[in-house]
Design a protein with these regions (language model features):
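Structural signature of extracellular appendage/secretion-system components
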Residues: 1-531
Length: 531
């Protein structure tokens, strides 16, 4: 009766936890009782039944597969979400003004002025289209940079979550070992530990090793122990790692990208182990965030030298801005009026006959000397000498009045004398022609040779391909996680039909045992009366 009562109690507990997240159904082992005493010649019927151990019905392979698929889904989800946001920046269609549409409008507007240089309305349109282009470039770059900053903050939040989870795992490890050492089942604690392992897998990929005492160690892919028996190692997010030997490279927003580390030292004398690359190359949401945000080597000097898809996208916008500041501005100056001098003398002029400045069509906010070499021509060397890392953030239009646009060129080049015919649109024609001319676009590790349209279309194609791939990866990962979850539940979760059938079976066995005892009692009473 005691055995059947225990079986009924276990079935009741399973039914009560049918909707408990992470609960693995229990089974009670029942064994035939072995009689240690044997008598020769005596028929041995048996000694009844005894209770064995309470077992959690789990499958290690399924549990590991579920965590692995959860980690893949975590990474794919982050990548799909953030790439979906960035994709709209490079859209070829839609109501919003993009860098691509603004470039087309700007060059088309200049082409119109080339046909009628004296028309103030057309010149006003150039100003409007130029401001739209500047706004589009600055806005696109800033949105990418802000996304990088947001991901940096998300990584810090994920690390806080990882630290809390590993701390709880270490506590459960200790409790499980203590309980099982006394022969008491720690099934509930093991269920809670599996839940925490699944939660941890959503953030980061790791391997586990169960020890004979019931504790589990968790290791990162490089072997670093996140949890070692009853000890959890706390990860840190820092922008001042001890392994940096000089100034750290800037982020796209001008700040510092954080590093995920473990401090073997103290707060006063830190000794950081860099785990950022290990986490980035793994799975989980933190891997997806790091792959998008990028990793900056401490030896880098520019935000565009970091890896990461967001850095690649921002570099394309930055390269367009730098080409506008150098190649386009250089063409805007016109041929040199006096090649015999070391300083370029512009042949282009506005409606008042004034020549444009070195950064006359597109400019940038900087209080120091912009023409560092003093040769009168804008160049990448001039930009580099300013110490500014990103010009897309501070790009501006180089003129503020419509008559200041230099549409014509000197009709009779003579040093010190500039004559611009009223209908001369040669300079505007030269600028408009640059739309279809091959340019060299450079920013950080990015180098692209082609026209403005080819550069932008390549950017659209790259971002679209990344988003499509991320969507496919997410769909596959989500489906794999769902299938694995179903398989795990089929093996480990509570089936009400099965438990109800067990209740009926155990109840009948209990009733039969009770009737047997009652029958034995009746027989004993009858024998007593006869005596």
């Amino acid at each position: 009766m005691t055995a059947q009562q225990a079986l009924l109690a276990n079935a009741s507990n399973n039914i009560a936890n049918v909707n408990t997240p992470g609960y693995s159904r229990r089974e009670v082992d029942i064994l035939a009782r072995i009689d240690p005493v044997t008598v020769d010649g005596v028929l041995r019927i048996g000694s009844g039944v005894q209770l064995g151990e309470i077992r959690r019905i789990t499958n290690t392979f399924l549990e590991n597969s579920l965590r692995a698929s959860g980690a893949k889904q975590g990474k794919a989800s982050v990548r799909n979400e953030y790439l979906g946001r960035v994709e709209s920046i490079f859209s070829l269609s839609g109501p919003q003004v993009t860098v691509g549409s603004a470039l087309n409008s700007f060059f088309s507007s200049i082409n119109q002025v080339a046909l009628n240089p004296a028309d103030i309305d057309l010149r006003l349109d150039i100003m409007q289209r130029g401001e739209e282009l500047v706004t589009a470039i600055r806005g696109a770059y800033q949105e990418i940079a802000d996304t990088q900053t947001e991901l940096d903050q998300r990584i810090a939040q994920d690390i806080d979550s990882i630290n809390a989870t590993t701390r709880d795992l270490a506590t459960l490890n200790s409790g499980i070992a203590q309980k099982e050492a006394t022969g008491v089942s720690a099934a509930d604690e093991r269920d809670q530990r599996d839940i925490l392992l699944g939660k941890l897998a959503e953030k980061v990929s790791f391997k586990t090793l169960e020890l004979p005492n019931g504790m589990i160690n968790c290791y990162l892919d490089n072997g670093f122990p996140l949890v070692s028996e009853a000890t959890a190692r706390r990860l840190e997010v820092t922008t001042n790692p001890s392994f940096a030997t000089g100034p750290l490279p800037p982020s796209l927003n001008g700040g510092i990208l954080s590093y995920v580390t473990f401090n073997f030292g103290s707060d006063a004398a830190p000794a950081h182990l860099d785990l950022t690359q290990t986490l980035k190359n793994g799975e989980g949401s933190i891997a997806g965030a790091l792959q998008l945000r990028g990793y900056a080597d401490t030896a880098n000097t520019s935000a565009f030298e970091a890896d990461g898809e967001l850095v690649q996208m921002a570099a394309r916008i930055e390269a367009i801005a730098r080409t506008l500041l150098t190649s386009v501005n250089q063409e805007y100056l016109g041929p040199d009026e006096d090649p015999s001098t070391a300083v370029h003398e512009p042949s282009a002029g506005d409606l008042n006959g004034n020549p444009p400045s070195v950064f006359g069509l597109f400019d940038f906010a900087f209080s120091g000397t912009k023409d560092a070499d003093g040769n009168g021509l804008p160049s990448l060397t001039d930009l580099t000498s300013t110490g500014i890392d990103s010009f897309a953030r501070i790009l501006s239009l180089g003129f503020s009045q419509p008559e200041q646009f230099a549409a014509g060129r000197d009709s009779n080049p003579t040093a010190g004398v500039r004559t611009i015919a009223p209908g001369d649109g040669r300079n505007a024609q030269a600028i408009a022609a640059m739309r279809t001319q091959t340019q060299s676009f450079m920013a950080g590790s990015l180098t692209f040779t082609g026209t403005f349209d080819e550069m932008y279309n390549s950017s659209v194609s790259t971002v679209g391909s990344l988003k499509s791939s991320a969507q496919s990866e997410y769909d596959v990962a989500r489906q794999a996680f769902t299938v694995t979850s179903v398989k795990r539940d089929e093996f480990s979760s509570v089936s009400l039909d099965e438990e109800f059938a067990n209740v009926i079976k155990f109840q009948k066995a209990f009733q039969a045992s009770a009737r047997m005892i009652r029958t034995a009692a009746d027989l004993l009473e009858m024998i007593t009366r006869l005596l």
